[in-house]
Amino acid sequence: MNHNSGEHQTKDSNSKSLPDICNVNNENRPILPSASTSNFQSSKSHRLSPWSINIVDDPDYAEIIKEAERAIKNGVLPARIAIGSSGSYFVRNCEGKTIGVFKPKDEEPYARFNPKWSKWIQRNLFPCCFGRSCLVNNQGYLSEAGASIIDEKLRLNIVPKTHVVRLTAESFNYSVHQRLFLTTKRRTNEIVDRHMPGKRIFELEELRSKVGSFQLFVDNYIGADDFIKQIEEQPLPDKAMEQFQKQFEKLVVLDYIIRNTDRSNDNWLVKYVVKPSNKRDQDEGDVAASSSKTTSINATNPNTEILIAAIDNGLAFPYKHPDEWRAYPFHWAGLKQAKIPFSEEIKSQILPFISDMSFVQHELCDEIERLFALDKNYSRRLVERQLSVMRGQILNLANAMRDGKSPLELVHLPGVLVERVRDHSLAGRKKFKKKFNDRYPLFSWF
């Protein structure tokens, strides 16, 4: 059990303890050119709604969204996922194959149309035990998309691609009066059409579309809990274990940077693929048959590939370090893989990115702020607090990697905030200041 540690310890950005933090002349002027900077500036200036149609820069992703829309139009409706604290849906194509997971903003735990009765009771009768005080309410869909941005920028390739889109489907949770009004209009038109073919009284309106995160669905993965139990009973070959360790370290990097408050061993997935041992085996079977299922561990075949999928990233990007009842620890810190220092391969991949404060600010922080600015309840002050936590996490991660620490040692480092403040002695230029978090939660173990 922890307690308050005392006053903030504040250091200037030019001190030796913060070597990678540099002064910024103007918050809207990049240190280095960035293709995203102009877009970010325009999104803050005009605040135009981007949700009229689903357009993304990735043509393959956009085509999957179109598949989902065609399927819904043809009656293949998204299916609500029973587990979880919010309304989330398996989205299928016209053939009935699951292609994504959609999580509407207005069906999140604190939202008006959350369909889970257990959460409604908890929210209304036991509010003191509900939610996470360090997170911004009803922004889980942005957190999902933000994790995908961090994953892409750092080239981790462990988060299934996620964007914010709009979808409309009758299987989503709408208000009773809205459904009743639409049903009454339809039935009235049907009655009129039976007596006067081709005539109708009402122009039918679609149910309003819902904005939310759409994450691509991944096949042939199993839960990390099941996978870890399997490899404890039947250890992996050395090469496969090295692959798993590197993938695990990528998960650590992602979760630590975004300060994921909900990473347990049942919301990250593992795919274990046994590749064909020779060309003949590969030619004889189709693609599906040439890769074995992930549920079977083959300790005798060294020709394997292990992949991790980090799903359920909706409870991340806090605006402060947890400092009340719960600490929301990373559950992977209890695994033996967390006791191994970061590998040279991961350090050589990640350190050049996170040691460059220009990259951190313009390729990570600005992109996250541009995403969060799309929300109708956007608060620049609150987002800046979220980014202060993220920059502090990045600073801790960089120092831990340089010092040869392990993920377990990383999570025991004191919480840090790196704030962007205006220096009046330097004609209003922006600089970064580091300070340690001075409040800790009552319970550190859950």
Predicted regions and their residues:
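Conserved ATP-binding subdomain of kinase catalytic cores across diverse folds
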Residues: 1, 59-239, 244, 256-260, ...
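Cytosolic, low-complexity regulatory segments enriched in Ser/Pro/Gly with interspersed Lys/Arg
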Residues: 1-66, 70-75, 116, 123-126
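C-terminal catalytic region of ATP-dependent kinase domains
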Residues: 3-20, 24-27, 31, 39-44, ...
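Alpha-helical interaction elements in eukaryotic regulators
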Residues: 60-64, 143-147, 164, 214, ...
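Active-site-proximal segment of zinc-dependent metalloprotease catalytic domains
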Residues: 236, 250-251
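Residue immediately N-terminal to the catalytic "proton-acceptor" Asp
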Residues: 261, 266
